Amino acid sequence: MTTLNVARVYLRVSSEDQDLQRQEAIIGNARESGYYVAAVYREKASGARSDRPELLRMIEDLQPGEVVIAEKIDRISRLPLVEAEKLVDAIRAKGARLAVPGIVDLSQLTEASRGVAKVVLQGVQDMLLRVALQIARDDFEDRRERQRQGIDLAKGAGRYAGRKPDTKMHERVIALKSGGCSIAETARLAGVSVSQVKRVWAQNQTKDKV
Protein backbone atom coordinates (compact mmCIF):
# COMPACT_ATOMS: atom_id res chain seq x y z
CA MET A 1 0.00 0.00 0.00
CA THR A 2 1.44 3.38 -1.06
CA THR A 3 1.73 6.01 1.65
CA LEU A 4 0.66 9.53 0.66
CA ASN A 5 3.28 12.08 1.72
CA VAL A 6 1.43 15.29 2.56
CA ALA A 7 3.22 18.64 2.78
CA ARG A 8 2.28 22.18 3.70
CA VAL A 9 4.51 24.84 2.16
CA TYR A 10 5.34 28.05 4.03
CA LEU A 11 6.67 31.04 2.06
CA ARG A 12 7.74 34.24 3.80
CA VAL A 13 9.38 37.58 3.09
CA SER A 14 9.94 40.28 5.68
CA SER A 15 8.11 43.26 4.19
CA GLU A 16 5.27 44.22 1.86
CA ASP A 17 7.58 45.51 -0.88
CA GLN A 18 9.45 42.19 -1.14
CA ASP A 19 8.38 39.52 -3.64
CA LEU A 20 7.53 35.91 -2.80
CA GLN A 21 7.96 34.81 -6.42
CA ARG A 22 11.49 33.48 -5.92
CA GLN A 23 10.24 31.01 -3.32
CA GLU A 24 7.33 29.73 -5.44
CA ALA A 25 9.61 27.10 -7.03
CA ILE A 26 9.52 25.24 -3.70
CA ILE A 27 5.94 24.17 -4.45
CA GLY A 28 6.87 22.49 -7.73
CA ASN A 29 9.98 20.94 -6.17
CA ALA A 30 7.88 19.44 -3.39
CA ARG A 31 5.49 17.86 -5.90
CA GLU A 32 8.39 16.52 -7.96
CA SER A 33 9.75 14.94 -4.77
CA GLY A 34 6.51 13.00 -4.37
CA TYR A 35 4.62 15.21 -1.94
CA TYR A 36 0.96 16.07 -2.17
CA VAL A 37 0.87 19.79 -1.33
CA ALA A 38 -2.19 20.25 0.89
CA ALA A 39 -1.80 24.03 1.15
CA VAL A 40 0.57 26.93 0.57
CA TYR A 41 0.86 29.69 3.18
CA ARG A 42 2.24 33.02 1.94
CA GLU A 43 3.29 35.66 4.44
CA LYS A 44 4.85 39.11 4.43
CA ALA A 45 6.03 39.59 7.99
CA SER A 46 9.23 39.50 10.02
CA GLY A 47 10.47 36.07 11.05
CA ALA A 48 11.29 37.63 14.41
CA ARG A 49 7.56 37.80 15.21
CA SER A 50 5.68 34.87 16.72
CA ASP A 51 2.19 36.24 15.91
CA ARG A 52 2.32 35.73 12.13
CA PRO A 53 -1.25 34.91 10.98
CA GLU A 54 -0.36 32.50 8.17
CA LEU A 55 2.22 30.66 10.26
CA LEU A 56 -0.31 30.19 13.06
CA ARG A 57 -2.96 29.10 10.55
CA MET A 58 -0.57 26.54 9.10
CA ILE A 59 0.19 25.08 12.53
CA GLU A 60 -3.53 24.94 13.26
CA ASP A 61 -4.14 23.09 9.97
CA LEU A 62 -1.36 20.51 10.45
CA GLN A 63 -2.31 16.85 10.66
CA PRO A 64 -0.25 13.93 12.04
CA GLY A 65 2.37 12.69 9.60
CA GLU A 66 2.47 15.86 7.52
CA VAL A 67 5.61 17.75 6.56
CA VAL A 68 6.27 21.50 6.73
CA ILE A 69 8.43 22.66 3.81
CA ALA A 70 10.19 26.03 3.65
CA GLU A 71 13.06 27.50 1.65
CA LYS A 72 15.29 27.84 4.71
CA ILE A 73 14.88 27.61 8.47
CA ASP A 74 14.97 31.42 8.71
CA ARG A 75 11.71 31.51 6.72
CA ILE A 76 10.13 29.64 9.65
CA SER A 77 11.84 31.55 12.44
CA ARG A 78 14.28 34.32 13.31
CA LEU A 79 13.05 34.30 16.90
CA PRO A 80 15.32 34.03 19.95
CA LEU A 81 16.26 30.37 20.49
CA VAL A 82 13.84 29.66 23.35
CA GLU A 83 10.88 31.06 21.40
CA ALA A 84 12.01 29.36 18.19
CA GLU A 85 12.13 26.00 19.95
CA LYS A 86 8.60 26.56 21.26
CA LEU A 87 7.49 27.20 17.68
CA VAL A 88 9.10 23.97 16.48
CA ASP A 89 7.57 22.12 19.43
CA ALA A 90 4.13 23.40 18.36
CA ILE A 91 4.71 21.90 14.91
CA ARG A 92 5.91 18.61 16.37
CA ALA A 93 3.00 18.52 18.81
CA LYS A 94 0.69 18.23 15.80
CA GLY A 95 2.59 15.11 14.75
CA ALA A 96 4.30 16.93 11.87
CA ARG A 97 7.95 17.46 11.02
CA LEU A 98 10.11 20.04 9.25
CA ALA A 99 11.74 19.49 5.85
CA VAL A 100 14.13 22.39 5.35
CA PRO A 101 17.34 22.48 3.25
CA GLY A 102 20.46 22.52 5.40
CA ILE A 103 18.95 20.48 8.22
CA VAL A 104 19.53 16.73 8.05
CA ASP A 105 16.27 14.88 8.68
CA LEU A 106 16.89 11.85 10.89
CA SER A 107 13.23 11.27 11.74
CA GLN A 108 12.87 8.04 9.76
CA LEU A 109 16.05 6.60 11.26
CA THR A 110 14.90 7.69 14.71
CA GLU A 111 11.51 6.02 14.29
CA ALA A 112 13.15 2.77 13.18
CA SER A 113 15.61 2.74 16.08
CA ARG A 114 15.26 1.50 19.63
CA GLY A 115 16.86 2.15 22.99
CA VAL A 116 20.11 4.12 23.16
CA ALA A 117 20.36 4.50 19.37
CA LYS A 118 16.95 6.20 19.27
CA VAL A 119 17.91 8.60 22.06
CA VAL A 120 21.22 9.45 20.37
CA LEU A 121 19.64 10.09 16.97
CA GLN A 122 16.93 12.27 18.49
CA GLY A 123 19.59 14.20 20.40
CA VAL A 124 21.62 14.77 17.23
CA GLN A 125 18.50 15.91 15.35
CA ASP A 126 17.60 18.38 18.11
CA MET A 127 21.17 19.71 18.26
CA LEU A 128 21.30 20.31 14.49
CA LEU A 129 17.98 22.11 14.62
CA ARG A 130 19.05 24.28 17.57
CA VAL A 131 22.23 25.28 15.74
CA ALA A 132 20.24 26.24 12.62
CA LEU A 133 17.70 28.23 14.66
CA GLN A 134 20.47 30.08 16.50
CA ILE A 135 22.25 30.90 13.23
CA ALA A 136 18.99 32.32 11.84
CA ARG A 137 18.61 34.52 14.93
CA ASP A 138 22.26 35.62 14.87
CA ASP A 139 21.90 36.63 11.22
CA PHE A 140 18.81 38.70 12.11
CA GLU A 141 20.66 40.43 14.95
CA ASP A 142 23.67 41.14 12.70
CA ARG A 143 21.44 42.66 10.01
CA ARG A 144 19.63 44.79 12.57
CA GLU A 145 22.92 46.03 14.03
CA ARG A 146 24.27 46.94 10.59
CA GLN A 147 21.02 48.77 9.86
CA ARG A 148 21.30 50.68 13.14
CA GLN A 149 24.89 51.63 12.37
CA GLY A 150 23.88 52.78 8.89
CA ILE A 151 21.07 54.91 10.31
CA ASP A 152 23.43 56.47 12.87
CA LEU A 153 25.91 57.33 10.12
CA ALA A 154 23.15 58.77 7.91
CA LYS A 155 21.79 60.84 10.80
CA GLY A 156 25.25 62.16 11.49
CA ALA A 157 25.53 63.22 7.87
CA GLY A 158 22.01 64.69 7.88
CA ARG A 159 20.75 62.23 5.26
CA TYR A 160 18.33 60.04 7.27
CA ALA A 161 14.65 60.86 6.71
CA GLY A 162 13.16 57.96 8.65
CA ARG A 163 11.32 54.85 7.47
CA LYS A 164 8.57 55.48 4.93
CA PRO A 165 5.16 54.06 5.90
CA ASP A 166 3.85 51.11 3.88
CA THR A 167 0.85 52.93 2.44
CA LYS A 168 -0.46 49.96 0.43
CA MET A 169 -0.52 47.75 3.49
CA HIS A 170 -2.16 50.51 5.55
CA GLU A 171 -4.86 51.02 2.92
CA ARG A 172 -5.58 47.28 2.76
CA VAL A 173 -5.85 46.96 6.54
CA ILE A 174 -8.14 49.99 6.81
CA ALA A 175 -10.35 48.76 3.95
CA LEU A 176 -10.75 45.29 5.47
CA LYS A 177 -11.38 46.60 8.98
CA SER A 178 -13.82 49.24 7.71
CA GLY A 179 -15.62 46.49 5.82
CA GLY A 180 -16.45 44.69 9.05
CA CYS A 181 -13.59 42.18 9.32
CA SER A 182 -12.35 41.35 12.80
CA ILE A 183 -8.76 42.19 13.75
CA ALA A 184 -7.71 38.54 13.37
CA GLU A 185 -9.45 38.17 10.01
CA THR A 186 -7.96 41.45 8.77
CA ALA A 187 -4.48 40.26 9.78
CA ARG A 188 -4.94 36.96 7.94
CA LEU A 189 -6.32 38.52 4.76
CA ALA A 190 -3.75 41.34 4.70
CA GLY A 191 -0.87 38.98 5.50
CA VAL A 192 0.32 41.00 8.48
CA SER A 193 0.44 40.49 12.22
CA VAL A 194 -2.40 41.21 14.64
CA SER A 195 -0.29 43.89 16.33
CA GLN A 196 0.25 45.64 12.97
CA VAL A 197 -3.51 45.71 12.35
CA LYS A 198 -4.13 47.19 15.80
CA ARG A 199 -1.45 49.85 15.26
CA VAL A 200 -2.64 50.86 11.78
CA TRP A 201 -6.30 50.94 12.86
CA ALA A 202 -5.50 53.00 15.96
CA GLN A 203 -3.54 55.48 13.83
CA ASN A 204 -6.46 55.72 11.41
CA GLN A 205 -8.96 56.32 14.22
CA THR A 206 -6.76 59.03 15.72
CA LYS A 207 -6.38 60.71 12.32
CA ASP A 208 -10.16 60.72 11.82
CA LYS A 209 -10.63 62.57 15.13
CA VAL A 210 -8.17 65.32 14.27
Curated annotation (Swiss-Prot):
Question: Listed GO molecular functions?
Answer: DNA binding; DNA strand exchange activity
Q: Name one GO biological process term.
A: DNA integration
Residues at the catalytic site: S14
Q: Does the keyword Metal-binding apply?
A: no
NAD among the record's keywords? no
Q: Where along the sequence lies the DNA-binding region?
A: 191-210
Q: Where does the record place the Resolvase/invertase-type recombinase catalytic domain?
A: 6-150
Which protein, by its recorded name, is this?
Resolvase
Q: What is the lineage of its organism?
A: Bacteria, Pseudomonadati, Pseudomonadota, Gammaproteobacteria, Pseudomonadales
